[in-house]
Amino acid sequence: MLALAVTVLAVSANAASFKWIASNIYGADGNKYAGEVTLMAYAVGDTAADAFVAATATSSDAGAVSYTFSNDSLVGGTSYNFFFTATQTIDGKDYVFTSAEKQNIAAQATQTPNVSFGNMATATQAAGAWTTAAVPEPTSGLLLLLGVAGLALRRKQK
């Protein structure tokens, strides 16, 4: 029983040690991930938005809406902003963004473009919530086991 208590103590002491290291992040193709492009999409007629310029009209009639942007070179680690503005309700699942340079704004630039803004809601309709759940600390179970082992040893000695 004493050997078990010593083993539990050694395991719990080892479980408390950890090592922080920094390493490269690799993409699905095995190349190092150099940077991330964050794009917030806003469409404004013939207006420059960061490095992107709307080259066509941005009317949103009853049909499909399409925008063409020029000067759209994406740089890793950079944020770009677009503004989608409209006076009527727009169904977000109808919007798709692809770059003429075949860059996927949601992944690495080497991947095929397949970006869509699906099931979007306006700020007045969307609500965020932060929920947490109680999770016991990993060593608390081991400490409980060590305490029960100590009580068992004490009871055995009496």
Please describe what each predicted stretch is.
Residues A149:
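Conserved Rossmann-like nucleotide-cofactor binding loop
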Residues A152-K158:
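C-terminal membrane-anchoring or membrane-association module
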Residues M1-A16, A127-L146:
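Short, threonine-centered small-residue motifs that mark membrane-proximal processing/anchoring sites
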Residues A16-A134:
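Mature extracellular "passenger" or substrate-interacting domains of secreted, surface-exposed proteins
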